[in-house]
């Protein structure tokens, strides 16, 4: 395996650092950035900020760095973002033409769909109003609430996030109408899917 220089800005703990180093023996790693872990905060090490020298040194970057720091670096062979969106990195002059750019599409669908469902329930059930009333001991109606069951939910974008959200709404008894950019068969969790024109 060829030796590479990898800059890792994804929050990692000692266990994951060791796994990366075992998976790529001979590679030199620099771990930088915000170093907090939701799943294992006891493993988090104090984070060091990413510097321009780190970015210029790297042949591989795992994680997100400010696009302005890349400036078409010829040394950078691969940028793997820890986000689905890569808009900042596809602008002219950010990456050299032969730099491989990959993203984390598919990594956040479940988590974001559950958050969206929580927000939908908060709005439909007026949960924030009832929470505030409970704190003040005022038990009065906050007006009519809605149910997801029997509602029609329109989902714009039926990719990973939209699909996961649609599936959860369907499981709660909603009629789901999806909109997507490319033609595909209607998934079982949607009643209708239309193309964006």
Model-derived features: positions:
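Rossmann-like dinucleotide/phosphate-binding beta-alpha-beta segment
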Residues: 144-197
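Short, polar loop motifs at secondary-structure junctions
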Residues: 11-14, 63-68, 85-86, 178-185
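Phosphate/diphosphate ligand-binding glycine-rich loop within oxidoreductases
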Residues: 56-134, 142-146
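Generic structural signal for small/hydrophobic residues in well-ordered secondary structure
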Residues: 20, 61, 79, 116, ...
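Phosphate-coordination loops involved in phosphoryl transfer and adenosine-cofactor binding
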Residues: 3, 98, 149-152
């Amino acid at each position: 395996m060829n030796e590479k220089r990898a800059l890792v800005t994804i929050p990692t703990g000692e266990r994951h650092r060791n796994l990366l180093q075992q998976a790529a023996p001979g590679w030199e790693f620099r771990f930088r950035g915000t170093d907090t872990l939701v799943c294992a905060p006891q493993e988090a090490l104090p984070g060091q900020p990413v510097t321009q020298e780190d970015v210029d040194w790297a042949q591989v970057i795992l994680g997100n760095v400010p696009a302005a720091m890349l400036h078409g670096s010829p040394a950078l062979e691969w940028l793997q973002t820890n986000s689905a969106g890569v808009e900042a990195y596809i602008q002219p002059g950010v990456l050299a033409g032969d730099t491989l750019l990959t993203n984390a599409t598919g990594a956040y669908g479940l988590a974001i769909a559950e958050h969206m469902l929580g927000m939908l329930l908060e709005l439909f059930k007026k949960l924030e109003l009832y929470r505030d009333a409970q704190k003040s001991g005022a038990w009065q109606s906050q007006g009519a609430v809605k149910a997801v069951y029997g509602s029609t939910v329109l989902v714009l974008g039926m990719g990973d996030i939209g699909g996961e959200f649609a599936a959860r709404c369907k499981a709660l008894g909603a009629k789901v109408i999806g909109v997507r950019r490319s033609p595909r068969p209607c998934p079982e969790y949607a009643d209708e899917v239309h193309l964006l024109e």
